Amino acid sequence: MSDDASTPAAERIPNKGKLAKDLNEVIRYTLWSVFKLKDTLPEDRAGYADEVQELFDQLAAKDVTIRGTYDLSGLRADADLMIWWHAETADQLQEAYNLFRRTKLGRALEPVWSNMALHRPAEFNRSHIPAFLADETPRNYISVYPFVRSYDWYLLPDEDRRRMLADHGKMARGYPDVRANTVASFSLGDYEWILAFEADELHRIVDLMRHLRGSEARRHVREEIPFYTGRRKDIGELVAGLA
């Protein structure tokens, strides 16, 4: 179940209720994988991006979708690029991850952070569907982070949690251009939820995150780092721009 009645208002989509009902029946795993360069890449990078793009094309034919590759360089000292992918099964994503690491580019990278999650219907707002699952157009920028609720959050009365999440969602209504992806990761790693915000303007994510700091629901968050933020680029542009 998604913890999120707290995400920005959805775009106006015809038959949105039916769409949400259908998509809530879908099991779809998603994975964010962050890497850093072991060393600077050689000046001659011929084949680095082509090999990865060929792999991505092969994966797409098996229903493994690469939603984006992202340039994280400079926003953190310990990360250079991130891949966001999703598939029907966790096994498919593990296979894709390992196939990528066997490429020339993959061998030049060191894993930094990788976390898997999947969509579960929202407890209090079943119409909330992650943007990736609704097949919305990917935006230019992304900010991904995990979070863990307080120990007493799940013991609170339903009406209290419903109210706090509804208030949190109302605070985000002024940011409909920031698309949310909140997915469950219980037992898949060290976190309960993974959240990815997408927007065409980076400052909109910054402003939304700052604004939501004022919500009552924030009292019930005990972990929400690390953050991985960057620009979406095709793999050729990304490789060309790396150090």
From Swiss-Prot:
InterPro entries found in the cross-reference section: ChdC/CLD (IPR010644), Dimeric_a/b-barrel (IPR011008)
The pathway where this protein functions is:
Porphyrin-containing compound metabolism; protoheme biosynthesis
Q: Which GO terms describe its molecular function?
A: heme binding; metal ion binding; oxidoreductase activity, acting on the CH-CH group of donors, oxygen as acceptor
What is the protein name for this chain? Answer: Coproheme decarboxylase
Q: What is its EC number?
A: 1.3.98.5
Q: Name the active site residues.
A: Y145
Q: What protein family is recorded?
A: Belongs to the ChdC family. Type 2 subfamily.
Reactions catalysed according to its record: Fe-coproporphyrin III + 2 H2O2 + 2 H(+) = heme b + 2 CO2 + 4 H2O; Fe-coproporphyrin III + H2O2 + H(+) = harderoheme III + CO2 + 2 H2O; harderoheme III + H2O2 + H(+) = heme b + CO2 + 2 H2O
Upper lineage is: Bacteria, Bacillati, Actinomycetota, Actinomycetes, Kitasatosporales
Q: Which of UniProt's keywords are assigned here?
A: Heme, Heme biosynthesis, Iron, Metal-binding, Oxidoreductase
GO terms for biological process, alphabetical: heme B biosynthetic process
